[in-house]
């Protein structure tokens, strides 16, 4: 026998769905500001130009001499991917969400493991007794491995969602998945990676500080301040991006539908600008730490070579 639904319940469901859609469309309309949208677009274009200028400067002026140049150019390319994805969303009425969301996912997820790689290299360099070679091979292999793994993850997500998945949640706005369950799953995956990165960066920062405290360095206080400040800022940034984990109990409610909040809609522009400043700060800190470490190891090696000759 075929079971049929009561007419009243069917009509009630349709009315509830229509009411939800209308409420979402109203929220999308109320959160739109022509001024803020224009300023966000200008800011994103400026960030793209600055990022491209930085990449060209590293390639043609610095010529990738230092290992830090390789890390920095990777961070800038990852930021460029994210900003390009967001700018396409701003200039497209549909947001081209399947393309732009995966561009932003690729840039941000690669950036997580790039920061971790830099922290790990600082830790390994501190435990090394000889100056590290200037070869970029290991760094390039690590970055290529990260890129391939994240790209594979994106392909798996695309296969799971389907090539025709609708990720649009309003004009110039996208969601993580076509359904609330998928949206929650992708959001939880990203936030979980950010939380893991934050915890590992804090752990590596503590290890570096512990090792510095047990080592005789001429610039030890300055190096400890350097490592502590940049490590905590980096970890705090990833902790903030992992906050959606607190709201996963409400299936997909965070970012699935439009809200009337202007901050929720237009924060990515200033956030990307802040990310560029943090990349520059982190790259400077990394370069300063490695140079100080190399100089200290070189001076120590010269001292030990000089001592036997003086004793004879």
UniProtKB/Swiss-Prot annotation:
Transmembrane spans: 41-61, 68-88, 96-116, 139-159, 193-213, 229-249, 270-290
Ranges facing Cytoplasmic side: 62-67, 117-138, 214-228, 291-312
Stimuli inducing this protein: Expressed early in the viral lytic cycle.
This protein's GO CC annotations: host cell mitochondrial outer membrane; host cell plasma membrane; mitochondrial outer membrane
Example GO biological process: symbiont-mediated suppression of host innate immune response
UniProt main location, coarse: host cell
Keywords (A to Z) from UniProt: Disulfide bond, Early protein, Host cell membrane, Host membrane, Host mitochondrion, Host mitochondrion outer membrane, Host-virus interaction, Inhibition of host adaptive immune response by virus, Inhibition of host innate immune response by virus, Inhibition of host interferon signaling pathway by virus, Inhibition of host MHC class I molecule presentation by virus, Inhibition of host PKR by virus, Interferon antiviral system evasion, Membrane, Transmembrane, Transmembrane helix, Viral immunoevasion
Disulphide-bonded residues: 28-258, 97-174
Family per record: Belongs to the Epstein-Barr virus BILF1 protein family.
Comment text on domains: The extracellular N-terminus and third extracellular loop are involved in host MHC-I down-regulation. The cytoplasmic C-terminus is also required for host MHC-I down-regulation.
Subunit structure: Interacts with host CXCR4 to form higher-order heterooligomers. Interacts with host Gi heterotrimer.
Physiological role: Constitutively active, ligand-independent G protein-coupled receptor that has immunoevasive and oncogenic activities. Couples with the host inhibitory G protein (Gi) in order to disrupt the host chemokine signaling. As a consequence of its constitutive activity, mediates host CXCR4 inhibition. Enhances degradation of host major histocompatibility complex class I antigens via lysosomes, thereby modulating the antigen presentation to cytotoxic T cells. Targets selectively HLA-A, HLA-Band HLA-E molecules. Targets also newly synthesized MHC-I/peptide complexes en route to the host cell surface.
Record's protein name: G-protein coupled receptor BILF1
Native source species: Epstein-Barr virus (strain B95-8)
């Amino acid at each position: 026998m075929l079971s049929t639904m009561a007419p009243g319940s069917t009509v009630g469901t349709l009315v509830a769905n229509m009411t939800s859609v209308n409420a979402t469309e109203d929220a999308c309309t109320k959160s739109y500001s022509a001024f803020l949208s224009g300023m966000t677009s200008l800011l994103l274009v400026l960030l793209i130009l600055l990022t491209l200028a930085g990449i060209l400067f590293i390639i043609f002026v610095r010529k990738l001499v230092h290992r830090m140049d390789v890390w920095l150019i990777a961070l800038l390319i990852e930021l460029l991917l994210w900003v390009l994805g967001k700018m396409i969303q701003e200039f497209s009425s549909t947001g081209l969400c399947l393309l732009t969301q995966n561009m932003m996912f690729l840039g941000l997820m690669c950036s997580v493991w790039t920061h971790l790689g830099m922290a790990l290299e600082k830790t390994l360099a501190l435990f090394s007794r000889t100056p590290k070679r200037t070869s970029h091979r290991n760094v390039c292999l690590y970055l290529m491995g990260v890129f391939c793994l994240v790209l594979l993850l994106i392909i798996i997500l695309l296969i799971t969602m389907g090539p025709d998945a609708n990720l649009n949640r309003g004009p110039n706005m996208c969601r993580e998945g076509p359904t609330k369950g998928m949206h929650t799953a992708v959001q939880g995956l990203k936030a979980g990676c950010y939380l893991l990165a934050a915890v590992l960066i804090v752990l590596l920062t503590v290890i570096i500080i512990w090792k510095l405290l047990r080592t005789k360095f001429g610039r030890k206080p300055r190096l400890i301040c350097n490592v502590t400040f940049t490590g905590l800022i980096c970890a705090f940034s990833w902790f903030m991006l992992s906050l959606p984990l607190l709201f996963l109990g409400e299936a997909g409610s965070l970012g699935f539908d439009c809200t009337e909040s202007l901050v929720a809609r237009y924060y990515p522009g200033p956030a990307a600008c802040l990310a560029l400043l943090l990349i520059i700060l982190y790259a400077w800190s990394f370069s300063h730490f490695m140079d100080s470490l190399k100089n200290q190891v070189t001076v120590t090696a010269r001292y030990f070579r000089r001592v036997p000759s003086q004793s004879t």
